[in-house]
Amino acid sequence: MHNASDIQSALVPMVIEQTAKGERSFDIYSRLLKERIIFLVGQVEEHMANLIVAQLLFLESESPDKDIFLYINSPGGSVTAGMAIYDTMQFIKPNVSTVCIGQAASMGAFLLAGGEKGKRFCLPNSRVMIHQPLGGFQGQASDIAIHAQEILGIKNKLNQMLADHTGQPLEVIERDTDRDNFMSATQAVEYGLVDAVMTKRG
């Protein structure tokens, strides 16, 4: 019985390269990493975040002055996992250019907006969605109150950071993230989440 990740990894294409020492084969993501391209695809969770952070740190060690390109196609996910990626993006020396392919929702949209100003893009038919953080907790009333306070604190922090990245007033962000707020690529530019719609490679 194969699990989903085994099947997925079996479907990842391999690229053959000729080198002075003969042929070398790479999976497609490793080959793109050589071009300083990182893919953030699927749910944002701890394991994925660790891999993205490791790739960012590796590319910084390789060339601290060259841009890194982070392609995002994600429905969102864990706030703490997303913040690990976000903080690393801000921490490292290279500029991180973000590109939305497909969708960037929730934490995916936050990471999209967190790219280097002037280097954040959407492809023409991609979708972006912002909303407030989700939380579900069961237990004693006092514990529920503690978690509710934590979620409120996270919501306020994320809203302030989105305001900083988009240039929108905080009260506008608070209003617009109160419910799921979907945007086209053009609307995401107008809102300040990205800087341009990219139709062709420049």
Curated annotation (Swiss-Prot):
Matching SUPFAM superfamilies: ClpP/crotonase
Active site location: S106, H131
Protein's UniProt name: ATP-dependent Clp protease proteolytic subunit
Organism: Shewanella oneidensis (strain ATCC 700550 / JCM 31522 / CIP 106686 / LMG 19005 / NCIMB 14063 / MR-1)
Subcellular location field: Cytoplasm
Key words, A-Z: Cytoplasm, Hydrolase, Protease, Serine protease
Enzyme class at the top of the EC tree: hydrolase
The reaction(s) this protein catalyses: Hydrolysis of proteins to small peptides in the presence of ATP and magnesium. alpha-casein is the usual test substrate. In the absence of ATP, only oligopeptides shorter than five residues are hydrolyzed (such as succinyl-Leu-Tyr-|-NHMec, and Leu-Tyr-Leu-|-Tyr-Trp, in which cleavage of the -Tyr-|-Leu- and -Tyr-|-Trp bonds also occurs)
Transmembrane region(s): none
Cross-referenced InterPro entries: ClpP (IPR001907), ClpP/crotonase-like_dom_sf (IPR029045), ClpP/TepA (IPR023562), ClpP_His_AS (IPR033135), ClpP_Ser_AS (IPR018215)
Subunit structure: Fourteen ClpP subunits assemble into 2 heptameric rings which stack back to back to give a disk-like structure with a central cavity, resembling the structure of eukaryotic proteasomes.
GO CC annotations, alphabetized: cytoplasm; endopeptidase Clp complex
